[in-house]
C-alpha cells in the first residue's frame, strides 16, 4: 500500500518502524515537525521520526503548517492510498483527511 506517515516524537518511531519492516508497504514520504532549537546553545535538533526516516533512506518533509495549499498539493501529487498519523502535532484539514483512497488512521 502507498503510505504517507506523519509523526514526530519517539512514540511515533515504533509505528513507522513497523510499517517499514513489514515489507508490505511503500512509504512515499514521512512528514514531521520542523527541527527546533534546544538546550543551552539552541542547537537545532532533528525529531526522532526524522532521524529514523533518514536512516531508512525515506523522503522527509517538515512543513510549518500542513494546511497550506502548497503542502496539500504535494500530498495530491504523492497520491497516497493511506495516511498514517502517530503523535504528529498538527491538525489535519478535511481535505487532507479525505485525500487518500483508504483515508487516515
Question: Model-predicted segments: where are they?
Answer:
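One-carbon transfer enzymes
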Residues: 1-105
Amino acid at each position: 500500500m502507498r503510505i504517507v506517515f506523519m509523526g514526530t516524537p519517539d512514540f511515533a518511531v515504533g509505528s513507522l518502524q513497523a510499517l517499514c519492516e513489514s515489507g508490505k508497504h511503500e512509504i512515499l514520504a514521512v512528514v514531521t515537525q520542523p527541527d527546533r532549537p534546544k538546550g543551552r546553545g539552541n542547537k537545532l535538533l532533528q525529531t526522532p521520526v526524522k532521524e529514523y526516516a533518514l536512516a531508512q533512506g525515506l523522503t522527509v518533509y517538515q512543513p510549518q503548517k500542513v494546511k497550506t495549499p502548497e503542502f496539500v498539493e504535494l500530498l495530491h501529487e504523492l497520491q497516497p492510498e493511506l495516511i498514517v498519523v502517530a503523535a504528529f502535532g498538527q491538525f489535519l484539514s478535511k481535505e487532507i483527511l479525505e485525500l487518500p483512497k483508504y483515508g487516515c488512521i
